[in-house]
Swiss-Prot record:
Gene from which the chain derives: xyl2
Lineage: Eukaryota, Fungi, Dikarya, Ascomycota, Pezizomycotina
UniProt protein name: Endo-1,4-beta-xylanase 2
Residues annotated as signal peptide: 1-18
Pfam families hit by this protein: Glyco_hydro_10
Organism: Claviceps purpurea (Ergot fungus)
Disulfide linkage: 280-286
EC number(s) recorded for this UniProt protein: 3.2.1.8
Cellular component annotations (GO), alphabetically ordered: extracellular region
Enzyme active site: 157, 262
Task of the protein: Endo-1,4-beta-xylanase involved in the hydrolysis of xylan, a major structural heterogeneous polysaccharide found in plant biomass representing the second most abundant polysaccharide in the biosphere, after cellulose.
Induction annotation: Expressed throughout the entire infection process during in infection of rye tissue.
Broad class of enzyme this protein falls into: hydrolase
Substrates-to-products reaction catalysed: Endohydrolysis of (1->4)-beta-D-xylosidic linkages in xylans
């Protein structure tokens, strides 16, 4: 199913893009996704990939509990184009086919990132070659899934903590213009998809990184670059929930959309999960939350127990608290 039909169904069910905070008891909703849609959001999603979906019980659980999936690794540069011009899509195709079968929205993740970048890309020395590589890579990957992806994370983690640009091969050769090149290539290849810039540590209203994100997104959008949304990864520690909620409001004011894209909170504290959830609900254009994994067992931070469900798919106390908002 194309994402546009899923989007239409979500809008029909909710009646609005988003709504102010209202009380919806758990008795009215049976899953995180249905709860969030009852608040006018598009989805509560999760990260997954072929390797996790093939584990016993995981695929069925995700299809039941969540409304969106993000490929954790299978759409990254090293997975899709490990050698120049040699593309591999087996794992990404598996995820997309699964999502379409279960009517789940998809967030494509990610075209350009400083990590999981093939060595051959890092070794590029001239501008023209790099521009061609960026455009070819994005047009090929986005073009393959044209019309099937709700949103793409076009660039990922491009800022340092002090708000300066991360010194990657992209920035070193092309300056900030590489961002324009990437977004324009993505828009050309998949014109109906929402295009995002995604980053971590955007959780403090006073952080230099957050201020840089807002500054540059505002500048780029004013210049006509097709930057539609900001993704806040939201890998949090206990006690960060309230600040994160305030930061989401600031990010939402800078773009058409904002989304919490990789949520996990060390120890899964109830108060922080409530604060983050309310923060998204209260921001009209916060379209959804993606948990960075369906259960602790499959989390990149498994030992920190940061997710809403334990290894046996049992909901934690934070789930009940969220559903009672």
């Amino acid at each position: 199913m194309l994402y546009t039909s899923i989007f239409a169904a979500a809008m029909a069910a909710s009646g609005a893009m988003a709504a102010p905070t209202t009380s919806h008891g758990a008795s009215n909703c049976t899953t995180l996704d249905s709860f969030f849609k009852s608040h006018g959001k598009l989805y509560w999603g999760t990260a997954a990939d072929k390797n996790t979906l093939m584990k016993p019980g995981v695929a069925d659980f995700i299809a039941k509990e969540f409304g969106q999936v993000t490929p954790e690794n299978s759409m990254k540069f090293d997975a899709t184009e490990p050698s120049r011009g040699q593309f591999h899509f087996d794992a990404a195709d598996y995820l997309v086919d699964y999502a379409e079968k279960h009517d789940l929205l998809i967030r494509g993740h990610t075209f350009l990132w400083w990590s999981q970048m093939p060595a051959w890309v890092k070794a590029i020395k001239d501008k023209d070659t790099l521009i061609d590589v960026i455009q070819t890579h994005i047009s090929t990957v986005a073009g393959r899934y044209k019309g099937k992806i709700y949103a793409w994370d076009v660039v990922n983690e491009i800022f340092e903590q002090d708000g300066s640009f991360r010194k990657t091969v992209y920035y070193n050769l092309l300056g900030e213009d590489y961002v324009r090149i990437a977004f324009e290539a993505a828009h050309k290849a998949d014109p109906k998809a929402k295009l995002y810039i995604n980053d971590f540590n955007l959780d403090d209203p006073n952080a230099a990184k957050l201020k840089a994100m807002i500054k540059y997104v505002t500048k780029w959008r004013a210049a006509g670059w097709p930057v539609h949304g900001i993704g806040s990864q939201s890998h949090l520690f206990a006690g960060m929930g309230e600040k994160s909620a305030a930061a989401i409001k600031m990010l939402g004011a800078a773009a058409d959309e904002v989304a919490i894209t990789e949520l996990d909170i060390t120890g899964a504290p109830q108060a922080d999960y409530e604060a983050v959830t309310k923060g998204c609900i209260d921001v009209k254009n916060c379209v959804g939350i993606t948990s960075w994994g369906a259960r602790d067992t499959d989390s990149w931070l498994a030992s920190k127990s940061p997710l809403l469900f334990d290894g046996n798919f049992k909901p934690k106390a934070a789930v009940k608290a969220i559903m009672a908002i």
